[in-house]
Amino acid sequence: MSLLNVQNLTVQFYNKSEIHEAVRNVSFSVESGEIVGIAGESGSGKSTVMRAVMGLLPDGAEASFERCEIAGGRQKAAMVFQDPMTYLNPSVTVGRQLKETIQVHYRRKAKRMKTDSRDGENRSMRKRLSENELESRALELLDMAGIRKGKELMRQYPFELSGGLRQRVVLAIALACEPELLIADEPTTALDVTVQRQILERLRRISVEMNMAVLLVSHDLGVIATLADRVLVMKDGQIVETGSAGDIFYAPETEYTKELLRSAAGKSALVGKMVSDRETLKIEKITKNFRIADGMFHKKENNAVNNVSLRIYEGETFGLVGESGCGKTTLARIVTGLLEPDSGALHYKGVPFPSLKKGRTKEQTRKIQMVFQDCSASLDPRCTVREILKEPLRIHKTEDPGEWDEKIEDMLVHVGLQKKDADKYPYAFSGGQRQRISIARALMPEPELLVLDEPVSALDVTIQGQILQMLRQIQKEKGISYLFISHDLSVVRRMSSRIGVMFAGGFVETGKTKQVYEDPWHPYTKELLAAELSPEPKKAKKRISSVTEETEEPARKASCPYAPRCGYVMECCRKERPGLYQFGDREVACFLYSEEHTGKRGAGYRMTSQI
């Protein structure tokens, strides 16, 4: 008997007089220890199927089926959701939330054993675990989820953790239920490539060690190829193709699956070009520190951005990549004036640009706009799209009020929406459509530089392609410069003419995108590129088998921050932080490129990769 058996599942949503059929006649099974991936675009019904299996459909939804059974009941299944912050209580420590789950599961297990026992052997089983037992079990689960400093982490709140750590905490909470089936709904969306690989490797390891089945839902074909043994492809609420990972990725039968694979393969196309040598933005030696809590009475200094300099030219896209917490978003907020740097300066077309607190004018603010990562959080759910797009016009007064409605409707058409969408609310749109609205709002005051912070991280490959194509077209028509921030290396490669790789608050390598991708000079850049997920199962599984989970923190401020993870570390790396060595269009922060290491350089010296 299969661990999970679903036959002819149909899910309908009722909205006033309308009925929407989200899932139609879906059938599949999952065996013990098997990893099954469900792929498809946003809105294809993947998450709805998972929620129906777990009995978590919202009010107004109705599921019908011939069979939807989990061997042993739903208590044998657990679910890891896409956004861990939505399911973690921000006002309760991680340790308390984990211990609560352990205690509840223990009570239910004891109750079942007592009910099922015929000879009374289990009737004396305790109803509660002691605090020491809870602590021990919590640390064991955190270790299983790949968290080494469990005691320290249990005292922290969810908002104090990085995205990767929050996802590991949710995984530990799910494992507390001792599931035989783990449903993972987009578990690595919006995580950087190195953390993605670590989470996926951890899931595979747990599946093997516990003989636990995993039902993996993702719009990212690289994630599916990396982990899944068998793949189901969904479109418009139906399964259109099923087969082994090898069959689906190397010999797809349906045109829809072929189109998905073409979209994933097309992500790596190089299209970014330099179009001007006229400088738009100049950043000089920007530094930003934050004081964060370290225990109850002490604070420690976090060096978020360290001595960063860069230039962005008219009509250019400069790509910014790096893992979570490296300082990308902090730098973006400094550029837009939302944060004030501790030191350094910004110049816009040769004119000093202060922060908003230091008196940046409305005209200066208008010239630099930002598109935020979470479009749902950045759009007011109480306002219509028309009201949202009117706000920047009202603030900057760039148009006559009588022309606002016409400009709003024209802008919606420009970003691929319809004029009639102006009077709808944000909840009526898909994720890709909401991101188009966010971009439209940023374009309303006619900026000259657009800061894009992870604009497509949570979107499937086909919607990603549409958004990126739209951004390129807008750039071509208006000559806008982009500061494009992403953890997705293939997206940055597709958009950028130049790229900067950040680690621990500073640049470790900059250069033309093609040069950096084809011939990385810094060991960290090489690590990032090696961690990129491939939509080919043979490559993906081979790569993940060699992943090691790094537990070292970046080194102290006086040394190279990458030294604890570097395979080329030298004695000087432990004593001093390297500056950026410049060679034509390229810069690299590594002592391997110093004169002391490579020798004196005469006229015409040409540096090559030292790794």
Label each residue range with its predicted role:
Residues 245-282, 292-297, 301, 512-611:
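Charged, flexible cofactor/metal-binding loops and thiol motifs
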Residues 39-41, 321-323:
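The feature captures the beta-strand-to-loop junction immediately N-terminal to the Walker
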Residues 114-152, 402-420, 529-530:
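Conserved ABC ATPase "signature" region
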Residues 62-75, 344-353:
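Conserved ABC transporter NBD signature motif
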